[in-house]
């Protein structure tokens, strides 16, 4: 009888764990929204966490070496916002996220960008020549292997704090600060 109770208890515990595991293991999805006022030639990219609603000017996060869809707005974006809902999103690639966003002057809420699982930051801010400040002190770069061209062409930056950058796994960082 004791053996039967132990088996029953084990099966119940296993079933409870199986039901709880997916709830804890689920990743928060992220998406990007482009907003351009009708009266303005320039607009804002906002990063959100959660399921992507239906509509226009919405983009999924890129993976690997795929260019992000929002690059089509690179010439017209003056502001990027990371909404607080994006804090639970874990992108694996920031490849080309703001490459050649030469009109970009402001990034708001960058502390809501969790980079703990990012492996590629190649050309992330490349060509953002109008940015004068950039706070990347909260970036977790422990898993990053590619940083080449990350700040290339960011000629307007007055200072940047990289003191928390962990470059132990970085294999490529050529032209990281060129230009």
Language-model region placement:
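Sec/Tat signal peptide C-region and signal peptidase I cleavage site
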Residues: 21-25
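Positively charged n-region of N-terminal signal peptides that target proteins for export
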Residues: 1-6
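Negatively charged
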Residues: 26-179
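Bacterial N-terminal signal peptides
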Residues: 10-19
């Amino acid at each position: 009888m004791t053996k039967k109770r132990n088996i029953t208890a084990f099966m119940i515990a296993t079933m409870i764990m199986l039901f709880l595991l997916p709830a804890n293991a689920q990743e928060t999805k992220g998406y990007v929204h482009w907003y351009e006022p009708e009266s303005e030639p320039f607009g804002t990219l906002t990063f959100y966490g959660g399921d992507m609603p239906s509509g226009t000017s919405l983009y999924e996060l890129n993976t690997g070496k795929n260019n992000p869809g929002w690059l089509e707005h690179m010439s017209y974006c003056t502001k990027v916002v990371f909404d607080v809902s994006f804090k639970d999103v874990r992108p694996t690639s920031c490849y080309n996220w703001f490459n050649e966003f030469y009109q970009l002057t402001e990034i708001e809420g960058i502390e809501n960008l969790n980079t703990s699982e990012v492996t590629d930051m190649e050309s992330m801010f490349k060509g953002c020549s109008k940015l004068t400040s950039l706070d990347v002190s909260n970036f977790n770069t422990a898993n990053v292997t590619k940083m080449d061209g990350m700040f290339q062409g960011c000629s307007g930056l007055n200072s940047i704090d990289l003191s928390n950058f962990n470059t132990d796994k970085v294999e490529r960082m050529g032209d990281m600060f060129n230009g």
